Amino acid sequence: MFDKIEELEIRYQELESLLAVPTVIANQPEFRKLSREHNDLTGLVEAYRRYKKVLAEIEGNRELLADPEMKEMAEAELEDLERQQEELEGEIKLLLLPKDPNDDRNVILEIRAGTGGDESALFAGDLFRMYSRFAERNRWKVEVMSASESERGGFKEVVALIEGQAVFAKLKYESGTHRVQRVPETEAQGRIHTSACTVAVLPEAEDIEIDINPVDLKIDVYRASGAGGQHVNKTESAVRITHLPTGIVVECQDERSQIKNRSKAMKVLKSRILDGLQQEQNARIAADRKQQVGSGDRSERIRTYNFPQGRMTDHRIGLTLYRLDALMEGDIAEVVDSLRAHYQMEALKAQAEAA
């Protein structure tokens, strides 16, 4: 393990030198590529350097054990240093796990109302607000790509692009069925209703990855409409694109310009096609090894939001929090971090079993 890290540390030093070369700085695509590689290695190299420093201090304290006057102090420091060594070894093992190539990407977030009618649409709006607030906390940018509003509020469907640092890494475990239990405002008897929404988190596709043949596209234009179906635009600015080979359909009517709507729809379409291809690949890998860590099966119920109890439970990791108001305002870092830690440990176990 440490031989591999030594090689990576040498590569890290090479990258630091390259990033200071004027010709590299002038070549922006190459500079960005090397910068990403440098950033990817920074955490590991820094942890390894701390680890080497702790090992040197442990060795020095062991030498002091032979000195009667220094023995007691050396033993106390040695205990703390050995604890640090163990923690750093665990951190380094996590940092050595194969990185999801999509982790640094922007995402296409799709939220759809499911069972529960109007209440489900209202909850879709609540979820979108929650993720938007979380994005603000992380200084991410949120851009609505398309939205189908419900007459009583919320969304039948909302699709948004979220741009920023490590967006997919933090949001990828949000894909799945989110269930809500609460008393609707229209419920006179005070009975709790259960409804659900589905959330999909797709890594944004880059143009170079998805090459779509124009022949495979059916493009329809129509007038944009608002809640209830009334037309809100006299020109045919809304766009519906169908990818004939896969049957994927994307609609966009958010902008007044047909060109802008077409551009947004194509961005969503490419991301959905890329996600489908990656899911097929993941399924093949899972079948080969009989196991898939963090499959993100979208058909399963992953989380319940119980408003009368002020409770949120994530069923995958058994995490229950009784501060639902704060969570719905985007304070979900604890949930996100717990999920990432859980699936990292699952990956470590799988790696150990395969060794």
Swiss-Prot record:
Molecular-function GO terms, alphabetical: translation release factor activity, codon specific
Annotated signal peptide: none
Cellular compartments per GO CC: cytoplasm
Tagged with keyword Protein biosynthesis: yes
PROSITE patterns: RF_PROK_I
Subcellular location: Cytoplasm
PTM: Methylated by PrmC. Methylation increases the termination efficiency of RF1.
Major site of localization recorded for this protein: cytoplasm
Keyword match Cytoplasm: yes
PANTHER family: LD18447P
Role of this protein: Peptide chain release factor 1 directs the termination of translation in response to the peptide chain termination codons UAG and UAA.
Record-stated family: Belongs to the prokaryotic/mitochondrial release factor family.
HAMAP family in UniProt: Rel_fac_1
Protein name: Peptide chain release factor 1
Source organism of the structure: Geobacter metallireducens (strain ATCC 53774 / DSM 7210 / GS-15)
Taxonomic path: Bacteria, Pseudomonadati, Thermodesulfobacteriota, Desulfuromonadia, Geobacterales
Gene, per the UniProt record: prfA
